[in-house]
Amino acid sequence: TLGYDGKGQYPVKSLKNLDSLDIDYSKGFILEKVVKLKKEISIIITRFSDQKYEIYEPIENVHENQILKYSKIPAEINDKILRQSKLWATQIAEELKYVGTLCVEFFIDRNDNLYVNEIAPRVHNSGHLTINAYNISQFENHVRAVCQLEQISLERIADAKMINVIGDQITIYRNKKFENNEFFFDYLKKEIKSKR
C-alpha cells in the first residue's frame, strides 16, 4: 500500500547505506534504478469483452514533491512515444484479459526511453479530466465495458488541464467563482489531510 506519492521510498546511493535506513526488511523491498526523468504520462484504455478497445490520448502528469500537481491533455510528446505508449498499454490490457478501464503510467527519461511506472486496473486520477475533454469519460467507458453496453468511439472535444487540489486548498476552491470553461469536482472527503 505504500509507494505512491513518495511514501515508503528511500533514495539509496550505495548498498552500504541500506543498514542505516528505517526499513522493516521482513516485509520485503524492491530496489529500483533511478530514472533521469523528463516527464510522466498516462495512457487510459478501456478494453471491452469482445477484445475491442477505446484508448484516450496520452495525458501528461506534472508532480511537485512527488505528488501530482496537475495533468493535461494533449501531452507534449513525440510520435514515437505516442505510438509506443499506446501499443504497450494495449498489450498490457490484452495480456491481463482485463475488461474495463485501466491506466498505465509511463516514465520518459531524458533519452526518450519509455518505462512502465504503474499499472492501475481501474479508473485513475490522471484520467479525471476525460469528463470534460472527451465525449465519453473514463468512468462511463468503464461502466460500458463491465456492463457490456454499446462501445462508442472516443472523440476529444477540448484540451484540458486538471489541477490536483490537496489538503486545506480545498476550502479556497469550494468558495471560488469559476469561469464558463472551468469546472470543480469535490469528493466531499470527511477529513481534510495534509498532502492528500
What are these regions (language model features)?
Residues I59-V62, I119-V123:
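Short beta->alpha transition motifs characteristic of CBS
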